[in-house]
Amino acid sequence: MPVLTRSRQPRKQRRALYRAPLHARQKLVSATLSPELREKYGVRSLPVRKGDKVRVMRGDFKGHEGKVVKVDLRRLRIYIDGVTVTKADGTPVFRPIHPSNVMIVELDLSDEYRKKMIERRAAGRRGGGNSE
């Protein structure tokens, strides 16, 4: 979790989360990678993006897999293809899921910036860089 405030007071921690800017919220929608992806990329977790394939690990939809349809940074929730509930009038609506309850099983690597970011983070975990 990114450091939003130095305070230890729960009141101020909650306020910082509530008032967090969108660029900080992007890190708050991180999910763990599957063991296979972890081994392949050398990274433990990444922010969820639209197009990633995820598996729900907790809750009523545990075990469901699907592509991420939408990432709502304001509510800190993600919407997954196939994870829907039916309204009283019969129309299906996506069920918001917190990213901590999912595991990324397939990454959408269509973005070059994301590829570079993964390589940077993996190098940091390996101890690469210019330390002596």
UniProtKB/Swiss-Prot annotation:
The gene is rpl24. Pfam families: KOW, Ribosomal_L26. SMART domains: KOW. Belongs to the universal ribosomal protein uL24 family. PANTHER family: 60S RIBOSOMAL PROTEIN L26 FAMILY MEMBER (PTHR11143). GO terms for biological process: translation. Keywords: Ribonucleoprotein, Ribosomal protein, RNA-binding, rRNA-binding. It comes from Aeropyrum pernix (strain ATCC 700893 / DSM 11879 / JCM 9820 / NBRC 100138 / K1). GO terms for molecular function: rRNA binding; structural constituent of ribosome. Gene3D superfamilies: 2.30.30.30. One of two assembly initiator proteins, it binds directly to the 5'-end of the 23S rRNA, where it nucleates assembly of the 50S subunit. Located at the polypeptide exit tunnel on the outside of the subunit. Part of the 50S ribosomal subunit. The keyword Ribosomal protein applies. InterPro entries: KOW, Rib_uL2_dom2, Ribosomal_uL24_CS, Ribosomal_uL24_euk/arc, Ribosomal_uL24_KOW, Translation_prot_SH3-like_sf. This is Large ribosomal subunit protein uL24. GO terms for cellular component: large ribosomal subunit.
